[in-house]
Amino acid sequence: MQSEMAIDTVATAEKSPLELLQQTKASVEAIIAKMLSIKQQGTPKSENRELLTQMFLNFINLRQANRSILIEEEKVRTETEIAKSPVDFTTLELHNLMYEKSHYLKANKASRDFKSRYPNIDLISEQDFFSDAPEAIKSQTLSNDSSHDLMLKRLNFELHQRKELCKLRVRLEQQKKSLLESNAERNKFLSSLPVHLKSLKKASLPVQSQLSLQNQKKLKYHNLAELLPPPLYVIYSQFMALKEAFEENIDVEVSGSLKDAQTYARQQAEQNSESLRLEVGVDEERQRKRLKKVGSDEGGVYQVHPLKVVLHVYDDEITDPKSHELVMLKFEYLLKLNVVCVGIEESEDGLEKNILCNLFPDDSGLEPPHQSAKLILGNDHVFDKSRTSRPYKWAQHLAGIETLPEMSPFFTDKDIQYSDTAKGYASASDHRNVQTVLQRIRSQKKTKLTLV
């Protein structure tokens, strides 16, 4: 019996755990079947002890097989863990490579789809690269592929060129900054130059008067006179001609805002050009707009042109006439009424004592000089008495504003012929005579000074 057990133990040692487990299972089943048959047949139970011993031996073999299976399982698990580590590492590398691939594909697509501001700029040509690139770039070896290596070198050379251009840009910006500072200093000097020129001009006035040089004021007034409205220009030219022809003791100036006068002249030029472009079919609409504009400008009837003519009248009976100024007249032009108004500059006298009132018969300056002005002023036909300057008839004649008379010059009634109106028309020639106007102004002023 012991020899059989020893044989079984050696046999189990040679078999695999799984075969041993199956064999032990079959042996246990056979022993159990034998024990059941002994019990059923009623044979002596002396054999049961031997069967139990074999049963225990089989249990021992079963536990041994189970232990061997567990050891082998642990060994396989350990080997699996050892083999899994490089697989996981390889898998991670694969995912990284796939991610890099997708990133490169996206970057490649973005580069291909990129629309530059200068899409026609190509990479530097090979000929220019070999002729202009420095040896440090051409001697590099960046890739085993010759074409790819050449492309990388061309890109590096282009990068080198761009860096040099950036340095040049910095130098140019510094140069620009220095030039701007220099220009600022020069502008500062130029802005202060008019003050120095003004003081120099003021200091040179005595020299100019000694050398009889041309007066710069005269040129200035001539330039301003080009912007005068036609009536004021006629007055200015007549007084200047009188002064130059007869050496009359007067001074004529043009005063006012040059900027406003230029703006007004520009607006008039634009209106004239616009009126030329209008067609005949829009005459009615243009007339409605004109009527509407006149109604809206009712408050601006006394709108004055920006420039004025100032006349200085000196005493002609003393040695130094310019040392004694008799009166200073101001001629201004009313745009809406088309009349020239005259007033005494800086006069403290009332309008009743003004020497210009009734300088000629029936010419107080309160009545508009022509019918169009009367229609614009309305039913009263009265000029604004609060204004210091008035539209005298002699001023209109001096300015060349000629209108149709209210009464026909061919009178048939003797009473009408010798009326005040007829006398006024008879004196129109005196109105146009500049010397006569100056003589009367001097006479009125001297008479007033004598009475005072």
Curated annotation (Swiss-Prot):
It comes from Arabidopsis thaliana. It comes from the Eukaryota. The lineage of its organism: Eukaryota, Viridiplantae, Streptophyta, Embryophyta, Tracheophyta. This is THO complex subunit 5A. Disulfide bonds: none annotated. One of its GO terms (cellular component) is THO complex. One of its GO terms (biological process) is mRNA transport. Acts as a component of the THO subcomplex of the TREX complex which is thought to couple mRNA transcription, processing and nuclear export. One of its GO terms (molecular function) is RNA binding. Belongs to the THOC5 family. Keywords: mRNA processing, mRNA splicing, mRNA transport, Nucleus, RNA-binding, Transport. Its main location: nucleus. It is found in: Nucleus. Component of the THO complex, which is composed of THO1, THO2, THO3, THO5, THO6 and THO7.
